Amino acid sequence: MPTLGVNIDHVATVRQARRTVEPDPIAAAVLAELAGAEGITAHLREDRRHIQDRDVRLLRQTVRTRLNLEMAATDEMVAIALDIRPDYVTLVPERREEVTTEGGLNVVGQRDRLALVVDQLQSAGIPVSLFIDAEPDQIAASAAIQAQWIELHTGRYAEAETEAAQAQELAALRQGCEQAIAAGLRVNAGHGLTYWNVYPVAQLPGMEELNIGHTIISRAVLVGLERAVREMKLAMQGKL
């Protein structure tokens, strides 16, 4: 079974709604780890809409599992990553007008730039994952620029409106896993996963980690964060 990385961005979203000091995403990360999360994910966006620089620095000091820093492939973010030294970095696309990340990186179209960033980070001992759609050309390009990981974008699977459409998207994810592993890549997945749709993705052969945030934080509002994390662990095992 894959491990669970808990994305704490939306704890920071609530805090930033009032520009105050609570709830603190650092405290949320501690509680998530105590409840069984094997990793903590935070996305430091260029517009700083939720996670702040202060959060990333404190997370690096406090996270005892693995810290996954999601970021755009910009010079500013590379400098921050080289300074903070997360356990690994996930490169994601960003548009200021988007509500959340809308799709995977276009590795094919940005190959030279992404190859440079991957080399900068991995030469410094920071493994890099690329957040991509489960498309053969994007997977091949990710392997070609020597990223260690990919994170398959599960948004289309999560948003499928019929069982047939969901089955089709799950098959694409399965094929993506197989292709990536054959190319020497390690595979994570995330985006839009919930307690009700996570189990089939968790069962994909070779899947190593699922990064999940919004549904856990939404559940935590009602039942508390520790219970919400424990329930997600059960859901990943098909036991919820």
Curated annotation (Swiss-Prot):
Its EC number is 2.6.99.2. It comes from Synechococcus elongatus (strain ATCC 33912 / PCC 7942 / FACHB-805). Pfam families: PdxJ (PF03740). InterPro entries: Aldolase_TIM, PyrdxlP_synth_PdxJ, Pyridoxine-5'_phos_synth. Belongs to the PNP synthase family. CDD domains: PNPsynthase. Keywords: Cytoplasm, Pyridoxine biosynthesis, Transferase. This is Pyridoxine 5'-phosphate synthase. One of its GO terms (biological process) is pyridoxine biosynthetic process. Homooctamer; tetramer of dimers. The active site is at residues 43, 70, 191. 3-amino-2-oxopropyl phosphate binds at residues 7, 18, 192, 213-214. It comes from the Bacteria. Coiled coil: none annotated. GO terms for molecular function: pyridoxine 5'-phosphate synthase activity. It is an enzyme of class 2 (transferase). 1-deoxy-D-xylulose 5-phosphate binds at residues 9-10, 45, 50, 100. Pathway: Cofactor biosynthesis; pyridoxine 5'-phosphate biosynthesis; pyridoxine 5'-phosphate from D-erythrose 4-phosphate: step 5/5. The record marks 151 as: Transition state stabilizer.
